[in-house]
């Protein structure tokens, strides 16, 4: 009779700690994992795991290319990107492709090229993934020792870490090269309402770049998410790229110190948990950037931030009522505070009304109207430009509020509009992903630590319902 489960299934967590494991099949008897445990069957089959790794990369790149072309096919140049539910074209536009002054799309061909390049790349990766999953060697250690590894080999693991860091650093420098030499990037702060420009005067001062890390995450401080100019962003990429590349060289050329060998668990599942923890942090940071930052995520493409839409509403009605003869400097609202303008806790002149809570908003359409003490009354009377009025009216009606059924707008709005901001989608999806990756980090860290301590026996599978069903074969 075919043995439906193996006693090995009770230890494997990290099959590495199970010296009796015979390589060969990818079934439950030989790996300790059933088919539904997916790539866990490949923990000690470096060649097959490479296939899974490459194929996964192919799926990611295929999604990017296919979704990119889908957005190009549906794109309507007359409407802003954020009204069309786009999430990829805004990223390409932010990099300065296909857009001109004011964020107007002047050419969609670069977007088409991007989609096609990703599709072609995904085909290459897909072929490589299938090749290594089906045809290539099960393990790489014998035929290609450079690409082979053992999870316990601390020196090899830090070498692989170093290679990854160098590739990440090179990626950071690609964005620097784009901003400096290859056409520049879109700067929402360029005079007159934003434009593509080359970033020439990089911020390389470490006290400025790393000062962001020391800021409070709350209120007007906003930690790294508060970055509001491209000089700091691109300068930060220079620093980060350099740190990653030097760190990569360091990890390739050194062996882990004794404290590191003692502090870490050195197993495949432990590395998985470390990676999930890092990705979780990335997800939470990306969530905050997409929601609050209007420099790295220009409002021309992603729609206004919440505070920006609120301040835009106050500005729009100030403009309207001032034209109708209201004295916006002295008019009182129903609470006795200023109806249009009031003072912040620190004395600056700010917009009055409910939007007072967003008084520290900085936005390119509003900053020209500020003076040394907040909003400048004479500028509000004489200097408001038509593009500022148009933009604030547009932002006022596109707040990042909305529900899954696409009925956007404020909850009290009767004629709700069919609109959900890309900021809502991006912030929500990255927060949820970040949360689940964090749970995955805890789960796999717990299993890896238990296995390393030697008390992980897995779940008792004797009474697993699936074992009483008829085998598929």
Curated annotation (Swiss-Prot):
Propiece residues: 1-14
UniProt family annotation: Belongs to the PsbB/PsbC family. PsbC subfamily.
Domain of life: Eukaryota
GO BP terms: photosynthetic electron transport in photosystem II
One GO CC annotation: photosystem II
Keyword set, alphabetical order: Acetylation, Chlorophyll, Chloroplast, Chromophore, Manganese, Membrane, Metal-binding, Phosphoprotein, Photosynthesis, Photosystem II, Plastid, Thylakoid, Transmembrane, Transmembrane helix
Membrane topology: Multi-pass membrane protein
Binding positions ([CaMn4O5] cluster): 367
HAMAP family attached to this UniProt entry: PSII_PsbC_CP43 (MF_01496)
Organism of this sequence: Huperzia lucidula (Shining clubmoss)
Entry function: One of the components of the core complex of photosystem II (PSII). It binds chlorophyll and helps catalyze the primary light-induced photochemical processes of PSII. PSII is a light-driven water:plastoquinone oxidoreductase, using light energy to abstract electrons from H(2)O, generating O(2) and a proton gradient subsequently used for ATP formation.
The name this protein goes by in its record: Photosystem II CP43 reaction center protein
Residues that span the membrane, as ranges: 69-93, 134-155, 178-200, 255-275, 291-312, 447-471
SUPFAM superfamilies: Photosystem II antenna protein-like
Record text on cofactor binding: Binds multiple chlorophylls and provides some of the ligands for the Ca-4Mn-5O cluster of the oxygen-evolving complex. It may also provide a ligand for a Cl- that is required for oxygen evolution. PSII binds additional chlorophylls, carotenoids and specific lipids.
Gene3D superfamilies: photosystem ii from thermosynechococcus elongatus
Subunit text: PSII is composed of 1 copy each of membrane proteins PsbA, PsbB, PsbC, PsbD, PsbE, PsbF, PsbH, PsbI, PsbJ, PsbK, PsbL, PsbM, PsbT, PsbX, PsbY, PsbZ, Psb30/Ycf12, at least 3 peripheral proteins of the oxygen-evolving complex and a large number of cofactors. It forms dimeric complexes.
Subcellular location: Plastid, Chloroplast thylakoid membrane
């Amino acid at each position: 009779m075919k043995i439906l489960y193996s006693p090995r299934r009770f230890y494997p967590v990290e099959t590495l700690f199970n010296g009796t494991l015979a390589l060969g099949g990818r079934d439950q008897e030989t790996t300790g994992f059933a088919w539904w445990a997916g790539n866990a069957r490949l923990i000690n089959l470096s060649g097959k795991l490479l296939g899974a790794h490459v194929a996964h990369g192919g799926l990611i790149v295929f999604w990017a290319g296919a979704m990119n072309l889908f957005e190009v096919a549906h794109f309507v140049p007359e409407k802003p990107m954020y009204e069309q539910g786009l999430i990829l074209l805004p990223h390409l536009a932010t990099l300065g492709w296909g857009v001109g002054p004011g964020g107007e799309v002047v050419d969609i061909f670069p977007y088409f090229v991007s989609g096609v390049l990703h599709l072609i790349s995904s085909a290459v990766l897909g072929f490589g993934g299938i090749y290594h999953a089906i045809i290539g060697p099960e393990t790489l250690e014998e035929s290609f020792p450079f690409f082979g590894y053992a999870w316990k080999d601390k020196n090899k693991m830090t070498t692989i870490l170093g290679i990854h860091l160098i590739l990440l650093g090179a990626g950071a420098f690609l964005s620097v090269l784009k901003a400096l030499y290859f056409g520049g990037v879109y700067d929402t702060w360029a005079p007159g309402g934003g434009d593509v420009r080359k970033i020439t005067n990089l911020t390389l001062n470490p006290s400025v770049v790393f000062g962001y890390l020391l800021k409070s995450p709350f209120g007007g401080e906003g930690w790294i998410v508060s970055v509001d100019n491209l000089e700091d962003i691109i300068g930060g990429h220079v620093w980060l790229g350099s740190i990653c590349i030097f760190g990569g060289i360091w990890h390739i050329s050194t062996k882990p110190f004794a404290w590191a060998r003692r502090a870490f668990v050195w197993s495949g599942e432990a590395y998985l948990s470390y990676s999930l923890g890092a990705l979780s942090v990335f997800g939470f940071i990306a969530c905050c950037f997409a929601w609050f930052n209007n420099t790295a995520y220009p409002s021309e493409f992603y729609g206004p931030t919440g505070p920006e839409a609120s301040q835009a509403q106050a500005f729009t009605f100030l403009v309207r009522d001032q034209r109708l003869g209201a004295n916006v400097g002295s008019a009182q609202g129903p609470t006795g505070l200023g109806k249009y303008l009031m003072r912040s806790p620190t004395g600056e002149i700010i917009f009055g009304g409910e939007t007072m809570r967003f008084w520290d908003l900085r936005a390119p359409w509003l900053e020209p109207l500020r003076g040394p003490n907040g909003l400048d009354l004479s500028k509000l009377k004489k200097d408001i430009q038509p593009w500022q009025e148009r933009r604030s009216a547009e932002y006022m009606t596109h707040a990042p509020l909305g529900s899954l059924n696409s009925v956007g707008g404020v909850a009290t709005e009767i004629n709700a509009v069919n609109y959900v901001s890309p900021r809502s989608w991006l912030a929500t999806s990255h927060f949820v992903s970040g949360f689940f990756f964090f749970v995955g980090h805890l789960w796999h860290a717990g299993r890896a630590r238990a296995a390393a301590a030697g008390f992980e026996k897995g779940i008792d599978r004797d009474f697993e319902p699936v074992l009483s069903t008829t085998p598929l074969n």
